[in-house]
Protein backbone atom coordinates (compact mmCIF):
# COMPACT_ATOMS: atom_id res chain seq x y z
CA UNK A 1 0.00 0.00 0.00
CA UNK A 2 1.47 3.27 -1.12
CA UNK A 3 1.54 6.36 1.11
CA UNK A 4 -1.51 7.93 -0.55
CA UNK A 5 -3.59 4.81 0.07
CA UNK A 6 -2.51 4.74 3.73
CA UNK A 7 -3.63 8.37 4.19
CA UNK A 8 -6.99 7.67 2.54
CA UNK A 9 -7.53 4.54 4.68
CA UNK A 10 -6.69 6.30 7.96
CA UNK A 11 -8.92 9.25 7.03
CA UNK A 12 -11.82 6.96 6.16
CA UNK A 13 -11.54 5.07 9.46
CA UNK A 14 -11.39 8.34 11.45
CA UNK A 15 -14.41 9.75 9.64
CA UNK A 16 -16.32 6.54 10.30
CA UNK A 17 -15.54 6.70 14.01
CA UNK A 18 -16.72 10.33 14.16
CA UNK A 19 -19.99 9.45 12.43
CA UNK A 20 -20.49 6.46 14.76
CA UNK A 21 -19.86 8.67 17.81
CA UNK A 22 -22.42 11.22 16.58
CA UNK A 23 -25.00 8.47 16.02
CA UNK A 24 -24.43 7.08 19.52
CA UNK A 25 -24.99 10.56 21.02
CA UNK A 26 -28.20 10.99 19.02
CA UNK A 27 -29.49 7.60 20.23
CA UNK A 28 -28.57 8.44 23.84
CA UNK A 29 -30.38 11.79 23.74
CA UNK A 30 -33.43 10.22 22.08
CA UNK A 31 -33.70 7.51 24.74
CA UNK A 32 -33.22 10.03 27.57
CA UNK A 33 -35.85 12.48 26.30
CA UNK A 34 -38.50 10.16 24.88
CA UNK A 35 -38.20 6.89 26.77
CA UNK A 36 -37.07 7.49 30.38
CA UNK A 37 -39.63 10.18 31.41
CA UNK A 38 -42.47 7.92 30.34
CA UNK A 39 -41.57 4.88 32.44
CA UNK A 40 -43.29 6.19 35.61
CA UNK A 41 -40.05 6.46 37.57
CA UNK A 42 -38.38 9.85 37.16
CA UNK A 43 -35.60 9.15 39.62
CA UNK A 44 -33.55 12.27 40.11
CA UNK A 45 -34.53 13.90 36.81
CA UNK A 46 -37.40 15.91 38.23
CA UNK A 47 -37.93 15.99 41.99
CA UNK A 48 -38.46 18.36 44.90
CA UNK A 49 -36.02 18.16 47.80
CA UNK A 50 -36.63 19.87 51.17
CA UNK A 51 -33.50 20.81 53.09
CA UNK A 52 -33.38 22.40 56.55
CA UNK A 53 -30.48 24.69 57.45
CA UNK A 54 -29.44 25.50 61.00
CA UNK A 55 -29.60 29.28 60.71
CA UNK A 56 -33.16 29.34 59.30
CA UNK A 57 -35.50 26.89 57.64
CA UNK A 58 -35.22 27.26 53.88
CA UNK A 59 -37.19 25.22 51.35
CA UNK A 60 -35.39 24.51 48.11
CA UNK A 61 -37.21 23.18 45.07
CA UNK A 62 -34.42 21.49 43.12
CA UNK A 63 -35.14 20.37 39.56
CA UNK A 64 -32.38 18.09 38.27
CA UNK A 65 -32.32 17.83 34.45
CA UNK A 66 -29.45 16.48 32.36
CA UNK A 67 -26.95 17.02 35.18
CA UNK A 68 -28.04 20.67 35.61
CA UNK A 69 -29.61 21.83 38.91
CA UNK A 70 -32.18 24.63 38.81
CA UNK A 71 -32.74 25.95 42.36
CA UNK A 72 -35.83 27.98 43.17
CA UNK A 73 -36.00 29.56 46.64
CA UNK A 74 -39.47 29.46 48.16
CA UNK A 75 -40.47 31.67 51.10
CA UNK A 76 -40.72 29.93 54.46
CA UNK A 77 -44.40 29.13 55.13
CA UNK A 78 -46.00 31.32 57.78
CA UNK A 79 -47.58 29.92 60.92
CA UNK A 80 -51.36 30.03 60.75
CA UNK A 81 -52.00 30.78 64.42
CA UNK A 82 -50.99 33.24 67.12
CA UNK A 83 -49.07 32.15 70.19
CA UNK A 84 -51.21 31.94 73.33
CA UNK A 85 -48.66 32.98 75.99
CA UNK A 86 -51.30 32.99 78.75
CA UNK A 87 -49.58 30.19 80.67
CA UNK A 88 -47.91 30.86 84.04
CA UNK A 89 -44.14 31.09 84.42
CA UNK A 90 -42.42 27.81 85.20
CA UNK A 91 -40.87 27.59 88.65
CA UNK A 92 -37.08 27.90 88.40
CA UNK A 93 -34.65 26.49 90.97
CA UNK A 94 -31.68 27.84 89.05
CA UNK A 95 -30.62 29.16 85.66
CA UNK A 96 -28.56 27.16 83.15
CA UNK A 97 -26.51 28.62 80.27
CA UNK A 98 -28.48 28.80 77.02
CA UNK A 99 -26.00 30.65 74.77
CA UNK A 100 -22.91 32.86 74.66
CA UNK A 101 -21.89 34.74 71.52
CA UNK A 102 -18.24 35.72 72.31
CA UNK A 103 -18.65 38.50 69.76
CA UNK A 104 -15.77 40.69 70.90
CA UNK A 105 -13.25 37.84 71.09
CA UNK A 106 -14.25 36.75 67.58
CA UNK A 107 -14.29 40.36 66.40
CA UNK A 108 -10.59 40.89 67.00
CA UNK A 109 -10.03 39.10 63.67
CA UNK A 110 -13.55 38.60 62.29
CA UNK A 111 -16.12 40.84 60.66
CA UNK A 112 -18.21 41.53 63.77
CA UNK A 113 -20.38 44.59 64.35
CA UNK A 114 -19.74 47.11 67.12
CA UNK A 115 -22.94 46.82 69.17
CA UNK A 116 -24.70 47.68 72.40
CA UNK A 117 -28.06 46.79 73.94
CA UNK A 118 -28.30 43.13 72.83
CA UNK A 119 -31.48 41.26 73.80
CA UNK A 120 -33.22 37.96 73.06
CA UNK A 121 -36.74 37.19 71.87
CA UNK A 122 -38.32 33.93 70.68
CA UNK A 123 -40.79 32.76 68.04
CA UNK A 124 -42.54 29.35 68.02
CA UNK A 125 -39.55 27.92 66.13
CA UNK A 126 -36.43 29.84 67.16
CA UNK A 127 -34.85 32.39 69.48
CA UNK A 128 -32.92 35.33 68.06
CA UNK A 129 -30.44 37.81 69.50
CA UNK A 130 -31.25 41.39 68.55
CA UNK A 131 -28.71 44.20 68.88
CA UNK A 132 -28.15 47.84 68.01
CA UNK A 133 -25.16 48.23 65.72
CA UNK A 134 -23.06 51.36 65.34
CA UNK A 135 -22.72 50.97 61.56
CA UNK A 136 -19.12 49.84 62.05
CA UNK A 137 -16.97 46.78 62.70
CA UNK A 138 -14.69 45.93 65.59
CA UNK A 139 -11.00 46.69 65.03
CA UNK A 140 -11.85 49.23 62.31
CA UNK A 141 -11.42 53.01 62.16
CA UNK A 142 -15.18 53.60 62.10
CA UNK A 143 -15.44 52.12 65.60
CA UNK A 144 -13.92 55.34 66.97
CA UNK A 145 -16.38 57.23 69.16
CA UNK A 146 -18.99 54.48 69.40
CA UNK A 147 -19.52 55.19 73.10
CA UNK A 148 -22.21 57.59 71.80
CA UNK A 149 -25.79 56.30 72.25
CA UNK A 150 -27.59 57.97 69.35
CA UNK A 151 -26.39 58.42 65.78
CA UNK A 152 -27.85 58.11 62.26
CA UNK A 153 -25.71 55.00 61.70
CA UNK A 154 -27.30 52.83 64.37
CA UNK A 155 -29.51 49.96 63.20
CA UNK A 156 -31.37 47.07 64.81
CA UNK A 157 -30.17 43.72 63.46
CA UNK A 158 -30.51 40.11 64.58
CA UNK A 159 -28.88 36.69 64.39
CA UNK A 160 -29.91 33.25 65.53
CA UNK A 161 -29.19 32.93 69.25
CA UNK A 162 -25.59 31.97 70.00
CA UNK A 163 -24.14 33.45 66.83
CA UNK A 164 -21.81 36.42 67.03
CA UNK A 165 -23.23 39.67 65.58
CA UNK A 166 -21.32 39.15 62.34
CA UNK A 167 -21.93 40.67 58.92
CA UNK A 168 -22.51 37.32 57.21
CA UNK A 169 -25.40 36.01 59.31
CA UNK A 170 -27.00 39.22 60.62
CA UNK A 171 -30.43 40.23 59.38
CA UNK A 172 -31.46 43.87 59.13
CA UNK A 173 -34.55 44.75 61.18
CA UNK A 174 -34.89 48.55 61.52
CA UNK A 175 -33.04 51.86 61.59
CA UNK A 176 -32.81 52.49 65.33
CA UNK A 177 -30.88 53.77 68.32
CA UNK A 178 -33.54 52.33 70.67
CA UNK A 179 -35.62 49.24 69.97
CA UNK A 180 -37.78 46.29 70.95
CA UNK A 181 -38.91 43.15 69.09
CA UNK A 182 -41.24 40.18 69.59
CA UNK A 183 -43.06 37.44 67.67
CA UNK A 184 -46.84 36.94 67.79
CA UNK A 185 -46.72 33.39 66.42
CA UNK A 186 -47.06 34.45 62.80
CA UNK A 187 -44.47 37.16 62.18
CA UNK A 188 -41.81 39.24 63.89
CA UNK A 189 -42.75 42.74 65.00
CA UNK A 190 -39.87 45.17 65.55
CA UNK A 191 -39.95 48.77 66.71
CA UNK A 192 -37.00 51.03 65.97
CA UNK A 193 -36.66 54.56 67.36
CA UNK A 194 -34.50 56.95 65.36
CA UNK A 195 -34.19 60.61 64.41
CA UNK A 196 -33.30 63.84 66.26
CA UNK A 197 -33.69 64.02 70.04
CA UNK A 198 -36.55 66.53 69.89
CA UNK A 199 -38.51 64.82 67.10
CA UNK A 200 -37.64 61.14 67.23
CA UNK A 201 -39.91 58.62 65.55
CA UNK A 202 -40.62 54.98 66.35
CA UNK A 203 -41.27 52.89 63.24
CA UNK A 204 -43.24 49.67 63.70
CA UNK A 205 -42.27 46.83 61.34
CA UNK A 206 -44.31 43.66 60.91
CA UNK A 207 -42.90 40.83 58.86
CA UNK A 208 -40.08 43.16 57.83
CA UNK A 209 -42.42 45.84 56.42
CA UNK A 210 -43.05 49.27 58.04
CA UNK A 211 -46.68 49.28 59.19
CA UNK A 212 -47.10 52.15 61.70
CA UNK A 213 -45.27 55.01 63.43
CA UNK A 214 -45.20 56.78 66.80
CA UNK A 215 -43.93 60.35 66.87
CA UNK A 216 -42.28 61.83 69.95
CA UNK A 217 -45.02 63.38 72.08
CA UNK A 218 -42.83 65.18 74.65
CA UNK A 219 -39.93 66.15 72.41
CA UNK A 220 -37.23 64.68 74.65
CA UNK A 221 -35.59 61.49 73.35
CA UNK A 222 -38.46 59.08 72.75
CA UNK A 223 -37.17 55.64 73.75
CA UNK A 224 -38.29 52.10 74.44
CA UNK A 225 -37.37 48.88 76.22
CA UNK A 226 -34.07 47.56 74.73
CA UNK A 227 -35.49 44.09 75.35
CA UNK A 228 -38.29 41.84 74.12
CA UNK A 229 -41.82 43.16 73.84
CA UNK A 230 -44.64 40.76 74.81
CA UNK A 231 -47.29 39.11 72.62
CA UNK A 232 -50.39 37.46 74.11
CA UNK A 233 -53.00 35.87 71.83
CA UNK A 234 -51.89 37.91 68.83
CA UNK A 235 -51.70 41.29 70.57
CA UNK A 236 -48.26 42.71 71.36
CA UNK A 237 -47.44 45.14 74.18
CA UNK A 238 -44.52 47.44 74.89
CA UNK A 239 -43.62 50.49 77.01
CA UNK A 240 -42.12 53.81 75.88
CA UNK A 241 -40.67 56.84 77.67
CA UNK A 242 -40.42 60.44 76.48
CA UNK A 243 -38.87 63.10 78.69
CA UNK A 244 -35.91 63.74 81.00
CA UNK A 245 -33.71 60.92 82.24
CA UNK A 246 -33.14 62.53 85.65
CA UNK A 247 -36.57 63.88 86.62
CA UNK A 248 -40.27 63.37 85.87
CA UNK A 249 -40.90 62.04 82.36
CA UNK A 250 -43.91 60.70 80.46
CA UNK A 251 -44.66 57.00 80.00
CA UNK A 252 -47.04 55.11 77.74
CA UNK A 253 -47.99 51.48 77.13
CA UNK A 254 -48.88 50.47 73.57
CA UNK A 255 -50.74 47.55 72.04
CA UNK A 256 -50.51 46.42 68.39
CA UNK A 257 -51.99 43.65 66.29
CA UNK A 258 -50.17 42.50 63.16
CA UNK A 259 -48.07 45.65 63.22
CA UNK A 260 -50.91 48.17 63.58
CA UNK A 261 -51.30 50.09 66.85
CA UNK A 262 -54.76 49.39 68.28
CA UNK A 263 -54.40 50.99 71.70
CA UNK A 264 -52.25 53.08 74.01
CA UNK A 265 -52.51 54.40 77.54
CA UNK A 266 -50.71 57.07 79.54
CA UNK A 267 -49.08 55.66 82.68
CA UNK A 268 -49.54 58.00 85.61
CA UNK A 269 -46.51 57.73 87.89
CA UNK A 270 -45.93 61.04 89.64
CA UNK A 271 -42.70 60.99 91.62
CA UNK A 272 -41.58 57.79 89.91
CA UNK A 273 -39.46 57.18 86.85
CA UNK A 274 -39.78 54.41 84.26
CA UNK A 275 -37.25 53.49 81.56
CA UNK A 276 -36.05 50.38 79.71
CA UNK A 277 -38.66 47.95 81.03
CA UNK A 278 -37.92 44.22 80.95
CA UNK A 279 -41.26 42.52 80.33
CA UNK A 280 -42.60 38.97 80.05
CA UNK A 281 -46.02 37.25 79.86
CA UNK A 282 -47.41 35.62 83.01
CA UNK A 283 -50.93 34.24 83.41
CA UNK A 284 -52.35 36.43 80.66
CA UNK A 285 -50.80 39.70 81.82
CA UNK A 286 -47.61 41.57 80.96
CA UNK A 287 -45.29 41.96 83.96
CA UNK A 288 -42.46 44.48 83.66
CA UNK A 289 -39.52 45.34 85.91
CA UNK A 290 -37.97 48.63 84.83
CA UNK A 291 -35.24 51.21 85.53
CA UNK A 292 -35.65 54.32 87.69
CA UNK A 293 -32.98 56.70 86.42
CA UNK A 294 -34.11 59.54 88.71
CA UNK A 295 -33.86 58.56 92.37
CA UNK A 296 -34.82 54.97 93.20
CA UNK A 297 -32.45 52.04 93.65
CA UNK A 298 -35.48 49.80 93.82
CA UNK A 299 -36.98 48.98 90.44
CA UNK A 300 -40.38 50.12 89.13
CA UNK A 301 -42.92 47.35 88.52
CA UNK A 302 -45.61 47.69 85.86
CA UNK A 303 -48.34 45.06 85.30
CA UNK A 304 -50.42 45.55 82.13
CA UNK A 305 -53.75 43.83 81.40
CA UNK A 306 -55.15 43.08 77.95
CA UNK A 307 -57.41 46.17 78.07
CA UNK A 308 -54.33 48.33 78.85
CA UNK A 309 -55.41 48.91 82.43
CA UNK A 310 -52.34 48.72 84.65
CA UNK A 311 -50.86 48.62 88.12
CA UNK A 312 -47.64 50.53 88.74
CA UNK A 313 -45.38 50.70 91.77
CA UNK A 314 -41.99 49.43 92.87
CA UNK A 315 -40.49 46.00 93.50
CA UNK A 316 -41.34 45.41 97.15
CA UNK A 317 -38.25 43.41 98.13
CA UNK A 318 -36.08 44.82 100.90
CA UNK A 319 -32.97 44.41 98.73
CA UNK A 320 -32.06 46.99 96.04
CA UNK A 321 -31.35 45.77 92.51
CA UNK A 322 -30.29 48.91 90.62
CA UNK A 323 -26.75 50.27 90.26
CA UNK A 324 -25.44 52.42 91.87
CA UNK A 325 -26.99 51.49 95.21
CA UNK A 326 -26.24 51.53 98.92
CA UNK A 327 -25.64 48.70 101.35
CA UNK A 328 -28.30 45.99 101.55
CA UNK A 329 -28.46 46.36 105.32
CA UNK A 330 -29.28 50.06 105.05
CA UNK A 331 -32.00 49.67 102.41
CA UNK A 332 -35.69 49.72 103.24
CA UNK A 333 -37.95 48.43 100.51
CA UNK A 334 -41.21 49.96 99.34
CA UNK A 335 -43.99 48.70 97.06
CA UNK A 336 -45.09 52.22 96.12
CA UNK A 337 -42.21 54.71 96.34
CA UNK A 338 -38.63 55.10 95.10
CA UNK A 339 -36.09 54.28 97.79
CA UNK A 340 -32.35 54.74 98.09
CA UNK A 341 -31.88 58.28 96.76
CA UNK A 342 -29.35 57.27 94.08
CA UNK A 343 -29.55 58.82 90.62
CA UNK A 344 -28.59 57.14 87.36
CA UNK A 345 -29.15 53.39 86.97
CA UNK A 346 -28.87 50.40 84.66
CA UNK A 347 -31.41 48.28 82.81
CA UNK A 348 -32.37 45.19 84.82
CA UNK A 349 -35.08 42.60 85.32
CA UNK A 350 -37.02 40.44 87.76
CA UNK A 351 -39.40 37.44 87.60
CA UNK A 352 -42.41 36.86 89.83
CA UNK A 353 -42.59 33.32 91.20
CA UNK A 354 -45.83 33.29 93.16
CA UNK A 355 -45.15 35.80 95.93
CA UNK A 356 -41.39 35.33 95.61
CA UNK A 357 -39.18 37.15 93.12
CA UNK A 358 -36.02 36.36 91.20
CA UNK A 359 -34.11 39.62 90.67
CA UNK A 360 -30.86 40.22 88.84
CA UNK A 361 -28.27 42.83 89.76
CA UNK A 362 -24.60 43.70 89.36
CA UNK A 363 -22.40 42.40 92.16
CA UNK A 364 -20.70 45.78 92.49
CA UNK A 365 -22.80 48.43 94.21
CA UNK A 366 -21.12 51.29 92.35
CA UNK A 367 -20.16 50.06 88.86
CA UNK A 368 -21.42 47.75 86.14
CA UNK A 369 -19.29 44.76 87.10
CA UNK A 370 -20.20 41.24 88.10
CA UNK A 371 -23.70 39.81 87.95
CA UNK A 372 -25.83 37.73 90.29
CA UNK A 373 -29.45 36.65 90.48
CA UNK A 374 -31.20 36.41 93.85
CA UNK A 375 -34.46 34.79 94.91
CA UNK A 376 -36.20 36.71 97.69
CA UNK A 377 -39.02 35.08 99.63
CA UNK A 378 -42.22 37.14 99.38
CA UNK A 379 -40.20 39.83 97.60
CA UNK A 380 -43.00 40.54 95.12
CA UNK A 381 -45.48 41.52 97.83
CA UNK A 382 -43.46 42.46 100.94
CA UNK A 383 -40.32 44.37 101.96
CA UNK A 384 -38.61 41.04 102.59
CA UNK A 385 -34.83 40.67 102.87
CA UNK A 386 -34.99 36.88 103.06
CA UNK A 387 -32.64 35.70 100.32
CA UNK A 388 -33.35 32.04 99.68
CA UNK A 389 -31.21 31.48 96.57
CA UNK A 390 -28.24 33.18 94.91
CA UNK A 391 -26.42 32.37 91.68
CA UNK A 392 -23.34 34.13 90.27
CA UNK A 393 -23.22 34.49 86.47
CA UNK A 394 -20.31 36.96 86.05
CA UNK A 395 -17.76 37.46 88.83
CA UNK A 396 -16.96 40.91 90.16
CA UNK A 397 -13.57 41.00 88.41
CA UNK A 398 -15.31 41.33 85.04
CA UNK A 399 -17.58 43.87 83.40
CA UNK A 400 -21.31 43.39 83.01
CA UNK A 401 -23.95 45.90 81.84
CA UNK A 402 -27.61 45.81 80.91
CA UNK A 403 -29.74 42.74 81.60
CA UNK A 404 -33.25 41.79 80.58
CA UNK A 405 -35.91 39.09 80.44
CA UNK A 406 -37.71 36.90 77.91
CA UNK A 407 -39.55 33.57 77.97
CA UNK A 408 -39.42 30.33 75.99
CA UNK A 409 -42.90 29.69 74.52
CA UNK A 410 -44.63 26.36 74.99
CA UNK A 411 -44.31 25.73 71.25
CA UNK A 412 -40.54 25.45 71.77
CA UNK A 413 -40.46 23.56 75.06
CA UNK A 414 -43.63 21.41 74.89
CA UNK A 415 -44.25 22.29 78.54
CA UNK A 416 -47.43 23.72 80.07
CA UNK A 417 -45.65 26.79 81.42
CA UNK A 418 -43.39 29.56 80.12
CA UNK A 419 -39.68 29.11 80.89
CA UNK A 420 -38.19 32.31 82.37
CA UNK A 421 -34.89 33.37 80.79
CA UNK A 422 -32.57 36.35 81.02
CA UNK A 423 -29.53 37.77 79.26
CA UNK A 424 -26.61 39.77 80.62
CA UNK A 425 -24.73 42.27 78.49
CA UNK A 426 -20.98 42.47 79.07
CA UNK A 427 -19.74 45.91 78.00
CA UNK A 428 -16.12 46.34 76.90
CA UNK A 429 -14.09 49.38 75.84
CA UNK A 430 -14.92 52.96 76.73
CA UNK A 431 -15.45 54.46 79.24
CA UNK A 432 -13.82 51.87 81.53
CA UNK A 433 -11.02 50.65 79.25
CA UNK A 434 -8.40 52.29 77.03
CA UNK A 435 -9.92 51.82 73.60
CA UNK A 436 -11.43 54.06 70.95
CA UNK A 437 -14.66 52.02 70.86
CA UNK A 438 -17.46 50.61 73.03
CA UNK A 439 -19.13 47.26 72.33
CA UNK A 440 -20.53 44.24 74.14
CA UNK A 441 -21.21 40.51 74.09
CA UNK A 442 -23.80 38.56 76.08
CA UNK A 443 -24.52 35.42 78.08
CA UNK A 444 -28.05 33.97 78.12
CA UNK A 445 -29.50 31.83 80.95
CA UNK A 446 -32.80 29.93 81.24
CA UNK A 447 -34.68 28.57 84.23
CA UNK A 448 -34.35 24.88 85.08
CA UNK A 449 -35.56 22.48 87.78
CA UNK A 450 -32.08 22.18 89.30
CA UNK A 451 -29.69 24.41 91.19
CA UNK A 452 -26.72 25.56 89.08
CA UNK A 453 -23.23 26.19 90.45
CA UNK A 454 -21.74 29.68 90.52
CA UNK A 455 -19.31 30.48 87.72
CA UNK A 456 -18.18 33.43 85.61
CA UNK A 457 -19.23 33.37 81.96
CA UNK A 458 -17.51 36.71 81.33
CA UNK A 459 -16.63 38.32 78.00
CA UNK A 460 -12.96 37.32 77.97
CA UNK A 461 -11.65 39.50 75.12
CA UNK A 462 -8.03 40.66 75.51
CA UNK A 463 -7.81 44.43 75.00
CA UNK A 464 -6.63 46.72 73.50
CA UNK A 465 -7.11 45.77 69.85
CA UNK A 466 -4.74 46.71 67.03
CA UNK A 467 -6.87 49.73 66.10
CA UNK A 468 -6.42 51.12 69.63
CA UNK A 469 -2.63 51.15 69.26
CA UNK A 470 -2.50 53.21 66.07
UniProtKB/Swiss-Prot annotation:
InterPro entries to which the protein is assigned, alphabetical: Glyco_hydro_34, Sialidase_sf
Enzyme Commission number(s): 3.2.1.18
Intravirion side: 1-14
GO CC annotation, single: membrane
Residue segments, region Involved in apical transport and lipid raft association: 11-32
S-S bridge residues: 90-417, 122-127, 182-229, 231-236, 277-290, 279-288, 316-335, 421-446
SUPFAM superfamilies named among the record's database cross-references: Sialidases (SSF50939)
GO molecular function: exo-alpha-sialidase activity; metal ion binding
Active-site residues, as the UniProt record annotates them: 149, 402
Stretches for region Head of neuraminidase: 89-470
Amino acids binding Ca(2+): 292, 296, 322
Membrane-traversing stretches: 15-35
Entry keywords, A to Z: Calcium, Disulfide bond, Glycoprotein, Glycosidase, Host cell membrane, Host membrane, Hydrolase, Membrane, Metal-binding, Signal-anchor, Transmembrane, Transmembrane helix, Virion
EC class: hydrolase
Activity regulation, per record: Inhibited by the neuraminidase inhibitors zanamivir (Relenza) and oseltamivir (Tamiflu). These drugs interfere with the release of progeny virus from infected cells and are effective against all influenza strains. Resistance to neuraminidase inhibitors is quite rare.
GO terms of biological process kind: carbohydrate metabolic process; viral budding from plasma membrane
Subunit details: Homotetramer.
Family to which the UniProt record says this protein belongs: Belongs to the glycosyl hydrolase 34 family.
Function summary: Catalyzes the removal of terminal sialic acid residues from viral and cellular glycoconjugates. Cleaves off the terminal sialic acids on the glycosylated HA during virus budding to facilitate virus release. Additionally helps virus spread through the circulation by further removing sialic acids from the cell surface. These cleavages prevent self-aggregation and ensure the efficient spread of the progeny virus from cell to cell. Otherwise, infection would be limited to one round of replication.
Protein name: Neuraminidase
Taxonomic source organism: Influenza A virus (strain A/Turkey/Canada/1963 H6N8)
Gene name of the record: NA
Amino acid sequence: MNPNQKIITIGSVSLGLVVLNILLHIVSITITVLVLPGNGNNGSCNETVIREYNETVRIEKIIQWHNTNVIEYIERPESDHFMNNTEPLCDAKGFAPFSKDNGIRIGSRGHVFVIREPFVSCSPTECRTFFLTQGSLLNDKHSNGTVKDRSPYRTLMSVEIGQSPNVYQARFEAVAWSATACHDGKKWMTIGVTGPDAKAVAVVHYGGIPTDVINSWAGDILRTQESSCTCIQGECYWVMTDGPANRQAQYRAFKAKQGKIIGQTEISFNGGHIEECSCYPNEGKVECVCRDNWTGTNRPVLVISSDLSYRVGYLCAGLPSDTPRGEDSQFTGSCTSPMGNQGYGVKGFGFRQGNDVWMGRTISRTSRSGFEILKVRNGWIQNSKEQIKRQVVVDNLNWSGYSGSFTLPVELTRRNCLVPCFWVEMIRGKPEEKTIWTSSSSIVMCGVDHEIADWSWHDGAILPFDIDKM
